[in-house]
Amino acid sequence: MPRRKKKIKEASESQNLEKKDLETSSCVSIKKKRRLEDLLIVISDSDGEETKEENGLQKTKTKQSNRSKCLAKRKVAHMSEEEQFALALKMSEQEAREVNNQEEKEEELLRKAIAESLNSCWSSAASATRSRPLAAELSSHSHQENTKDSGTTEGVWQLVPPSLCKGSHVSQGNEAEQRKEPWDHNENTEEEPVSGSSGSWDQSSQPVFENENVKCFDRCTGHLAEHTQCGKPQESTGSGYAFSKAVQGRGDTSRQCLPIPADTKGLQDTGGTVHYYWGIPFCPAGVDPNQYTNVILCQLEVYQKSLKMAQRQLVKKRGFGEPVLPRPPFLIQNECGQEDQTSDKNEGISEDMGDEAKEERQESRASVWHSETKDFQKSPIKSLKQKLLLEEEPTTSRGQSSQGLFVEETSEEGLKSSEGDNSVPTTQSIAALTSKRSLVLMPESSAEEITVCPETQLSFLEPLDLNREDSPDSRELPIEVRMAVGDKQVANREDCMKENPPPAVSSSTRVSCPLCNQDFPPTKIEQHAMYCNGLMEQETVLTRRRREAKNKSDGRTAAQPALDANRKEKCYLCKSLVPLGEYQCHVEACLQLAKVDREDGIEGTRRPRVCAPVEGKQQQRLKKSKDKGHSQGRLLSLLEQSEHRTTGVEKKPKYSEVRTFRMPSPEVEEASCSREMQSTLSQLNLNESPIKSFVPVSEATNCLVDFKEQFAFRSRTKSGRGRRRKS
């Protein structure tokens, strides 16, 4: 059994080797056929005698090759595995040697051709005389090489005998004489298949190499070019000759080497031939190829330099502009100190007086921030400010709304001491504090400076207590009594202004916010605009601060007085800016007047109106005389009631028209309370409050989101997915 298996294995391996040999032999036969087809064509004018002889030689060669192949196949079939392996190794070594020899020959020929092309151009006569002995020598050399390789390679090719070459020379010479075409001065040697290793190539006929090298002489330049094999001759025409096909290297790619025909008329005029040198495009006759190549290189160098210069001109760097440096801190403080004067230039005398009071309070507040600790024990106002600043801190990061309405905690002793002092000593202490402002606000201590702007600070002397409830007695008092009390308060304030006149400050650089119509300095407008939501922002700030004030005032009997009432708030009824301390009184007066006008329904109610700031002063004076225990304010409730009652009121006039509601001075109060101003109250639109703009989710009709059905829809989809997964 084991012997039979070995025999079977040997038989299978022998079959595989036979198949491989058949494939290799078929490839070799195909190559040989291609070589036969790609033989060098020799042009002659004979009647075809040479072609018949060549065809006979080719047939005999093919028959011999086929016989040798059959014998080799039979031998391989009878060989053992070891013999087949040894034969395969020998064949591979022979092929490698042939390839190496061929590559070396090609390199040598290339070197020689390049050297000769660079030296000089041979004349056609000299090339004709040298062609015949070179052909004889190279043909004998090729015969010797073929005899050496006959034992190792299959299908040895024989070259064309010299008799054919001679015949072709004679026939070509005769034909050239008849045609009289000026291709070369030497008419006897137009086409000669010569093999040589030296000579210059032109672009018209470049050499192509093959295993068996057959070389022909190029008629145009007189140089030598290498070709593969001789083929069928073709009859020559008047335009060109010598179609020479070759196969380059091992790639088996054919190429035609065609001579470029020159212009016959130009040649006749000049009397010479135009030579094209190897490697140089269109080098004219009589010019050194080396010099011509140098000219081309110089042109390329100039072009490259000009291109670089053009690119450098296109790319230009832009210079950096001047740096944007921040302003020094003392300029910012001057702007903050001057921001209130120019904004109120064109307003009345009462507004100017209010601005002066605001500037006084602002200076006193700014001086408290930077005063020393020794001064806090001397003055009760200083100690009160220190306590307030230590206790109170902003609760949010907003630049404008975080410093809204808030109430500070202070002790009852500070409250009593501040109430016990008259207005004159208070102003004197404020003036003493403001005298130190120039020493405190120095640019050296810019890291510790805090710029104070009136729109972002609260009134410490006259705080707005939103949670306190108005007593019924104060609401029942007639407006005439309030007017009388307000006159006294205004007189006291005028005396204070005369004693301590504040410095003149300009506010020409103030910028108004387009959303909330409030004026801010340039240093604060950007920070405010980032978080400003219009009128809704003020309402949210009021409600939030009202909760904080309610929590802080639970354990206190009365609200403390603040140090300043510098901030202005906008009244939603008359659309006018009111000082923060007088805001609540002003709103209540506006509501009462609107209610009276609505109930009467007559525009001619001749009840004299009180100016907004005067009404605020009267109400504040009356409320200070009452008990401090009423801490529940009713501003929001009154606003809501007035909105629900007046749903059909017409839209109010523009802000510029309603602005006449503010009076120039307290001396001209009667003129402000005219019929025209009362008629504007009847046209007030109370529906513009931010509270009314809020719409609950249940009443939203234009919303794209269905708040009621969204949760049910999600539950259905989840249950459906679960069922699908279970199934």
Curated annotation (Swiss-Prot):
Molecular-function GO terms, alphabetical: DNA binding; histone binding; K63-linked polyubiquitin modification-dependent protein binding; nuclear retinoid X receptor binding; zinc ion binding
Chain segments carrying region Necessary for transcriptional repression: 1-101
Region (Disordered): 1-23, 45-70, 133-206, 326-427, 607-654
LR motif (motif): residue ranges: 60-78
CDD domains: AIR_RAP80-like
Region AIR: start-end pairs: 270-400
Name of the featured protein: BRCA1-A complex subunit RAP80
Keyword terms, alphabetized: Chromatin regulator, DNA damage, DNA repair, Isopeptide bond, Metal-binding, Nucleus, Phosphoprotein, Repeat, Transcription, Transcription regulation, Ubl conjugation, Zinc, Zinc-finger
Source species taxonomy: Eukaryota, Metazoa, Chordata, Craniata, Vertebrata
Modified residues (Phosphothreonine): T51
Subcellular location field: Nucleus
Gene name of this polypeptide: Uimc1
Region (Necessary for interaction with NR6A1 N-terminus): 100-200
Organism: Mus musculus (Mouse)
